Swiss-Prot record:
Known EC number: 4.1.2.13
Keyword terms, alphabetized: Glycolysis, Lyase, Schiff base
Protein name, entry field: Fructose-bisphosphate aldolase class 1
Family named by the database record: Belongs to the class I fructose-bisphosphate aldolase family.
Length: 296
């Protein structure tokens, strides 16, 4: 593990850029960027277009390591190059810590939750991540209803996989998303917090994780988790809120920082000039940084 990157993730001021839309969500991400499905004819062309978009983001002067601590990549992005270097090396050289999304998507809903599908190639994927100088990983589950068994299952699965990731020398981001429209969102979050605390308490002193959570209904609910000795950082997802709304809610939560995807890229368009693109990205970065660093 890179100690300098660990220090940056633990104590740095800023947020994490989530650039990890994968196969299923790519057409939607491209469409929002202004690239329609008639502009590519197969998956390779689609992934090249999305890589072009991500290259434009990470090479922009607005994508500054003074504001952006880390970036989460999709497997395809890890294997591609930016300006002649593998993406993770390009980011690390720029001062941004690289993470890799490792999950294979969500299983069918059961007990009010969606567990992760089995990650059959996890071992070889983590070996490749190490070769590519990736610092950590990210994997997402989804909680839709107040169901204690379901929430317990989500957290147990996350920690089980997290321990395999830690054994390979990487720092896992555990992401049990709570749907922002869930009827009993505040109650779900209390149960989730208790289960996460149990999981964290089961780790050895040298087993470090990060958490990526939905912004809680009750401000500072997760402060205790952020202060847990095994937690490097707690980051939050935008989860369907607009950037303005997500930033506003984030400001009420001390010690939590953003890890936004859609809320970061929502004003970026393929046909913008370099100046327009850099300004739109810069405005987004500035506001998300502010919500991550300057609290109410």
């Amino acid at each position: 593990m890179n100690k300098e990157q660990l220090e940056k993730m633990k104590n740095g001021k800023g947020f994490i850029a989530a650039l990890d839309q994968s196969g299923g969500s790519t057409p939607k991400a491209l469409k929002e960027y202004g690239v329609n499905e008639d502009q590519y004819s197969n998956e390779d062309e689609m992934f090249q277009l999305v890589h072009d978009m991500r290259t434009r983001v990470v090479t922009s002067p607005s994508f500054s390591p003074d504001k952006i601590l880390g970036a989460i990549l999709f497997e395809q992005t890890m294997d591609r190059e930016v300006e002649g270097k593998y993406t993770a090396d390009y980011l690390a050289d720029k001062g941004v810590v690289p993470f890799l999304k490792v999950d294979k998507g969500l299983a069918e809903e059961q007990n009010g939750v969606q567990l992760m599908k089995p990650i059959d190639n996890l071992d070889s994927l983590l070996d490749r991540a190490n070769e590519r100088h990736i610092f950590g990983t990210k994997m997402r589950s989804n909680i839709l209803e107040l169901n204690e068994q379901g929430i317990k299952d989500v957290v147990e699965q996350q920690f089980e996989v997290a321990k395999q990731i830690i054994a390979k020398g990487l720092v896992p981001i555990i992401e049990p998303e709570v749907n922002i429209n869930a009827k009993d969102k505040a109650e779900i979050e209390k149960v989730l917090k208790a289960e996460l605390k149990k999981g964290l308490d089961s780790l050895n002193a040298d087993q470090l994780v990060m958490l990526k959570l939905t912004i809680p209904t009750e401000p500072n609910l997760y402060k205790e988790l952020a202060e847990h000795p095994n937690v490097v950082r707690v980051v939050v997802l935008s989860g369907g809120y607009s950037r303005e709304k997500a930033n506003e809610l984030l400001k009420d939560n001390d010690e939590l920082i953003a890890s936004f995807s859609r809320a970061l890229a929502s004003d970026l368009r393929a046909d913008q000039s370099k100046e327009e693109f850099d300004k739109a990205l810069g405005d987004a970065v500035e506001s998300i940084y502010d919500a991550s660093v300057n609290k109410n």
